Amino acid sequence: ETAYGGGTLAGTEPDADITGMTIQALSPYYGERDDVTGAIDRALDWLSETQLASGGYGTMGAETSESAAQVIVALSSVGIDCAKDSRFIKNGKWPMPGLFQYYLPEGGFMHVAAGAANNGGGEAGTLNGMATEQGMYATAAYKRLLDGRTALYDMSDTTLSAGEVVDVSTSN
């Protein structure tokens, strides 16, 4: 945890991706341990303060789909509906539209938008495997929250039978 409340992989400047991942890792203890709850609350404050006008987030000098995805999973993991919590709505935009601005008709996500600064994570404006993976599991995490289910990494409420097809659409 940095002095600002966010998490960092290296150095002293917080990063949205690492902050989101840290919240995800600590979320099972949120509300149960004062030290963890305090750290997550400080991280949430930092995420609220650093959210971009698009509703999304950035890392290493560039707005990215993966940053928005990590924040969506983090918020969902502690029971925050980012469409309703005013801390995570900027200019009428919230993290899901911040993520879906990177969605491509081919069925996946870009790392960064065409013409955007590239921070080394993938070619701007093109379908990206890591961005798609993270975008899809962020969407699943948010849907699980909306459906009143457990967090993404807690599948204790899920049972599947061989050959069963699960509806993962986001429409309610």
Positions of the model-derived regions?
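An alpha-helical repeat/solenoid feature that recognizes helix-turn-helix modules
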Residues: 1-41, 52-92, 104, 108-147
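Intrinsically disordered, low-complexity repeat and linker tracts
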Residues: 150-172
